[in-house]
């Protein structure tokens, strides 16, 4: 899944420090709002809507295109998924499982590092909550499947993971601080940083030691590492391989049931496009890595980005056209929205994910 950096090399100069210096030129001069925006403002001019969603410098098109779709289909429900947390910050509600806590400092971190450029902070709050959710699911699975973690220790770990609380915040922060640009993790570095973060959020030292020690158990660290590799961008990895970041998981997290298919299945994709037009369905489509016709990229350069996720906004069966939106909020300008003949959609797109 493409970030703006990968698609247009030379536009951005990156520095992996506490702050990120960005130089923008040309048609894609998209202002980063980290410094100017009030971090206490959840919603901007467009509220919870696709037009408010704008991807940051990471390759999170799979997340931003999906959130834009959910915002189109169920804006009130998505707005209701962000709740105030009594201890500060927010709680993010999902279709299943515990709520995730997102603190103001984690929202600020995301803005400083340009994880997101959306209006307000609601998309970034959902993004941090989603990152914690995918971690939680992988950790629960790893603990349940482990034959080496002592039976008397498992209940402690599962009890922490079965409730909304700061444990996943600590994991999220620790991973963000040590993840490499390709999504890889160093076990020793993660264990050390996780211990620090667990202590900082107030988990007793003995329990913090046990929880960090799980990373030494066979299969446990592997589960964490795989989750980060598959969802590396939401943890701050600038250049992952695009493996596993599928929109169906994001749609599923916020809307319940979701499925995926291939655009080459003409009958299947037409059925979903008709459902989309009828209303109530979220649909995200991903472009191919390449197309056999060399002229295609030239003829469609105003919007074409390979292996990139787009929100599908509408389908006009009479005109045989599909309307989509680039989560960059541009290309094409001014808002990333464009309409394609159905034949061009078939030629340029590989797969889709939809709510059920």
Name each model feature, range by range.
Residues 37-356:
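Accessory/interaction modules and long regulatory regions
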Residues 19-31:
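Bacterial N-terminal signal peptides
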Residues 4-22:
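Bacterial N-terminal signal peptides that target proteins for export
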Residues 32-36:
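Sec/Tat signal peptide C-region and signal peptidase I cleavage site
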Residues 12, 26-29, 70:
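Alpha-helical transmembrane segments and their juxtamembrane interfaces
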């Amino acid at each position: 899944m493409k970030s703006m950096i990968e698609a247009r090399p030379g536009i951005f100069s990156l520095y992996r420090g506490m702050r990120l210096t960005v130089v923008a030129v040309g048609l894609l001069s998209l202002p980063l709002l980290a410094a100017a925006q009030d971090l206490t403002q959840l919603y901007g001019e467009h509220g919870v809507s696709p037009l408010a969603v704008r991807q940051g410098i990471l390759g999170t098109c799979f997340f931003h295109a999906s959130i834009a779709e959910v915002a189109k289909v169920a804006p009130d429900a998505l707005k209701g998924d962000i709740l105030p947390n009594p201890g500060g910050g927010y709680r993010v509600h999902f279709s299943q499982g515990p709520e995730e806590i997102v603190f103001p400092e984690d929202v600020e971190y995301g803005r400083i590092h340009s994880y997101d450029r959306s209006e307000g902070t609601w998309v970034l709050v959902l993004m941090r909550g989603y990152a914690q959710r995918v971690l939680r699911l992988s950790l629960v699975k790893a603990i349940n499947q482990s034959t080496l973690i002592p039976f008397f220790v498992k209940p402690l770990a599962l009890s922490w993971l079965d409730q909304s609380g700061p444990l996943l915040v600590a994991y999220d922060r620790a991973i963000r601080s040590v993840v490499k640009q390709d999504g890889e993790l160093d076990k020793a570095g993660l264990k050390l940083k996780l211990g620090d973060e667990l202590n900082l959020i107030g988990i007793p030292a003995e329990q913090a030691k046990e929880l960090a020690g799980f990373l030494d158990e066979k299969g446990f660290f592997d589960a964490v590492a795989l989750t980060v590799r598959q969802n590396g961008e939401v943890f701050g990895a600038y250049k992952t391989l695009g493996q596993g970041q599928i929109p169906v998981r994001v749609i599923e997290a916020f809307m319940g049931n979701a499925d995926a298919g291939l655009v080459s299945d003409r009958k299947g994709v037409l059925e979903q496009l008709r459902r989309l037009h009828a209303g109530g369905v979220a649909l995200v489509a991903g472009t191919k890595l390449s197309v056999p016709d060399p002229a295609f990229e030239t003829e469609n350069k105003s919007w074409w980005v390979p292996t990139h996720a787009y929100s599908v906004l509408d389908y006009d069966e009479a005109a045989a056209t599909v309307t989509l939106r680039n989560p960059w909020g541009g290309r094409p300008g001014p808002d990333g929205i464009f309409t394609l003949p159905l034949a061009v959609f078939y030629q340029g797109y590989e797969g889709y994910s939809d709510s059920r």
